[in-house]
């Protein structure tokens, strides 16, 4: 009975982030694209400013990287979120599964692991699909700074 109960419980509810396989870890990403928006840092204060400017490799419509497996070849500054460096990324959105699980919180009901698709996430406007602009179309990056979210203060 206990084995059946364990298998019915989703992996993210029965494993810590450290216990997850690489495939499970990767599947936590909801594909919102928020990590793929450029951030600007104030040289004097190290304060991070969020923009709506998408990385060149982000397909804005699908919110997927065009070259995910080889992304560092195309974008050397692309982040690689790992179990070890997760605490360094304080700017991750409140909706990020990695952040939520690290804080002991549940996945949101719209998360693709809960629903089986990204439709609910896009419907909730969690993804950057509705706000992102192509890097090639930006003249002055400062014009694209978003209001800093309250959680990042």
Curated annotation (Swiss-Prot):
Q: Name one Pfam family in it.
A: CxxCxxCC
The protein, known as: UPF0260 protein YcgN
Q: Which family does it belong to?
A: Belongs to the UPF0260 family.
HAMAP family, from UniProt?
A: UPF0260 (MF_00676)
**Domain of life (superkingdom):** Bacteria
Q: Which organism is it from?
A: Salmonella typhi
